[in-house]
């Protein structure tokens, strides 16, 4: 997505399909359907190898074309690309002088399994929540915490979700009937996230106040529903279904509706146990990256409805703790948590645009000026006009 922008601004730029090629499958590509086995060579390409090869080859081509190698090299990625960015930091720290990881899809096993949780809650309760009711819950949260949507000037989003009990909304009238206690129970479970039999949290839930039903530019949400023969049914996120179908069951014909809560929880932990160390891209030892004086810009939308923000917040906290604390990590890391910003800035909330983010990163790498604040802008999705601009402080600047 950023390649045309880079080219228009005079940069040499490169991309890779990671060996995926013209496979028509959107998310089931790791499965070799001829053998019903995972293709680990292709998975290694996806995890890190292809981006490293791209960097090496691109620099050689640039050197041949221009007679000299690039002075500075940068990597920017969002979502899966954000995961790619952190894979470069962790696995190939020498490849890029500056890296921007935005809304990174790390903690892959927990993320994908947890993305199925809202649909599981609605299915198992027999009580899917239509958009009309989800809007009421969100509106109630924003009435109590109006700065969550980013429209009120706020230095940064909180590092933890606000506390809100969905039962406060019970009785509120909507176009599809009043909010019931069952509705509130479903909403609270979605916000809490998956919890195992002994009450241990398996992963985070959606933050209260997050748009989660597809009222955004790409009509995507992990708490979506659809009508089938006049009956409302949960519609799970395709990546979540694919994770179970491909990684867990290795069956392209598997039907998620056959899954009950107990089995889901067992398989959640099984997937983490079996695959986490290989594919989660959450290594926190960045000493090699730091030693090279390379710079990492880590950004996350606090209203992300696809990548649970608290998973990235947790990664950041552990990273800082295990790399000597803020006094050490501030030399190579800045973290920005944007209030009201949806996944990849696909909603109305304010986010860091490519120009602001890359300019800040380049200035840090090339001039030594660390970005303690970055301008964020809210764009009207219909008109493309800027609705407002705010200044977002880094977590480091806020102490």
Language-model segments: which ranges?
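C-terminal His-loop and adjacent cap/lid subdomain of alpha/beta-hydrolase
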Residues: 1-399
């Amino acid at each position: 997505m950023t390649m045309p922008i880079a080219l228009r601004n005079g940069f040499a730029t490169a991309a890779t399909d990671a060996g995926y090629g013209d496979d028509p499958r959107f998310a089931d590509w790791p499965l070799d359907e001829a053998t019903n086995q995972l293709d680990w060579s292709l998975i290694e390409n996806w995890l890190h190898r292809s981006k490293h090869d791209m960097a090496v080859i691109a620099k050689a081509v640039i050197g041949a074309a221009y007679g000299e190698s690039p002075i500075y090299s940068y990597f920017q990625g969002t979502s899966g690309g954000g995961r790619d960015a952190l894979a470069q930091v962790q696995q190939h720290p020498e490849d890029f002088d500056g890296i921007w990881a935005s809304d990174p899809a790390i903690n892959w096993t927990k993320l994908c399994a947890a993305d199925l949780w809202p649909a599981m809650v609605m299915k198992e309760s027999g009580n899917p929540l239509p958009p009309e009711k989800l809007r009421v819950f969100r509106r109630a949260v924003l009435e109590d915490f109006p700065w969550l949507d980013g429209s009120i000037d706020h230095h940064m989003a909180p590092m933890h979700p606000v506390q809100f009990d969905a039962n406060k909304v019970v009785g509120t009238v909507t176009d599809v009937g009043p909010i019931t206690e069952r509705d509130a129970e479903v909403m609270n479970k979605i916000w809490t996230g998956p919890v195992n039999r002994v009450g241990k949290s398996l992963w985070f839930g959606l933050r209260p106040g997050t748009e989660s039903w597809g009222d955004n530019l790409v009509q995507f949400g992990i708490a979506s529903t659809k009508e089938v023969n006049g009956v409302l049914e949960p519609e799970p996120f395709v990546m979540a279904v694919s994770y179970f179908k491909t990684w867990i069951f290795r069956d392209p014909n598997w039907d998620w509706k056959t899954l009950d809560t107990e089995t889901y929880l067992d398989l959640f932990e099984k997937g983490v146990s079996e695959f986490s160390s290989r594919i989660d891209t959450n290594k926190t030892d960045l000493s090699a990256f730091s030693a090279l004086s390379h710079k990492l810009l880590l950004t996350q939308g606090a209203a992300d409805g696809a990548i649970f923000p608290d998973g990235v917040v947790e990664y950041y906290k552990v990273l800082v703790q295990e790399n000597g604390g803020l006094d050490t990590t501030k030399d190579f890391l800045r973290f920005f948590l944007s209030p009201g910003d949806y996944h990849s800035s696909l909603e109305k909330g304010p986010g860091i645009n490519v120009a602001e983010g890359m300019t800040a990163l380049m200035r840090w790498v090339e001039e030594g000026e660390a970005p303690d604040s970055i301008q964020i802008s809210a764009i009207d999705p219909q008109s493309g006009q800027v609705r407002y601009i705010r200044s977002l402080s880094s977590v480091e600047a806020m102490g």
